[in-house]
Amino acid sequence: MKFYFAPLEGVTGFTYRNAFADLFGGVDKYYAPFISPCVNDKLKGKEIRDILPENNSGKVNLVPQILANRADYFIKATKQIMDMGYTKEININIGCPSGTVVAKNKGSGFLRDTDAMDRFFEEIFNWRDSDESGLDISVKTRIGVNDAEEFPEIMEVYNQYPISELTIHPRTRKQMYRDTPDMNAFDYAFKVSRNPLCYNGDIRTVMDYENFAKKYNVDAVMIGRGLIANPQLVNEIKGQEKLTKEMLKQYHDRLYRDFEKIMKADKHLLFKMKEFWNYVSWNFEDENKCAKLVRKCQNLYKYNLAVEEIFGTMELK
C-alpha cells in the first residue's frame, strides 16, 4: 500500500511538509495545495512559492495540484510547473468543496457539467500525448455536487481517459466534510473504474485503515486530517510505535520555530499555532480542555504557558 498526504489549503504548505518529513516521514507522496491558474501568461511568485524546489526538502516527494476548468489554463500552468522540474505527475483538483471555488465551476463545482469535463480531459490528454512528455495526469474527485446519483455519469467521463490515478473522496460537495463517506459509491467505482484508484476519506486511526484495507484491494490511500491530527498515523499503520507526547512536542517546537522565522507578526504566529492545535488536541484524553486552553490565548506569552501546561499535565489517549 502506498500512502499519500492530502493537501489542505492554508495548512500543509512547505514549512509544514518539511517538518513532517524530517520528524515522521513514511509518506510516499505529498500533494501540494492547489494552484489556480488564470488569464495571466505565467503563474506569479505567490502562486508558485509553495512548490519552488528550493522551498521543499529532498525528503518530500511533491506532486503539484492544479485547480482549473479550462484546458488552456491547465496546459499553460503545467508547462511552467514542468519547467520547474515537476515532470512526473500533475494532479487535477475536482474535489474542493469551498463555496468560492464551486461558484466558479471549479473543484467539485466542475462535476455539475460532465460535458465540459469531457471536453477538458480530451484537450489536455491530446496535448499530453502530442507533447510526448510521459507526464502522469492524476485526478482527485468527489462523487457529485448534490447527490451520489450523479456519480455514474461522472465515472463515465473518467473511464474514457488514461488517468494515472483517480483519488475518490466519497462525499458530495453538499456534504462538505459532514456525515460519513458513501462507501456504496466507492464500491461502484471499485467495480467499474478503468483507472487505478486511491481512497481518501476519514482514515483517522489504525483501525479505520485496517477496516478499509480488509475490504478493498487498492494501491493507495490518501490521508489528510487524520495525518494532521496524528502525524505518526502512517508509521503506526506500518507497525511502529504509537505517537508519544515527546514526538508531538518536538513537532510542535519545530513548527513554532519555523513559522516564527517567516511570520511578520506575533498574531500571525499565534493563529498558525492555534490551527495546529485544532487538529492535534484530538490526541489528548481531555481533548476539549486541551483545545479550550489554546483557544482562549490572546498572545504568545499566554499561549506558551498553555502549551507548557498541556505537555506537562495532560496525557494522550
Predicted segments, located by residue:
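Flavin-dependent oxidoreductase catalytic cores
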Residues: 1-317
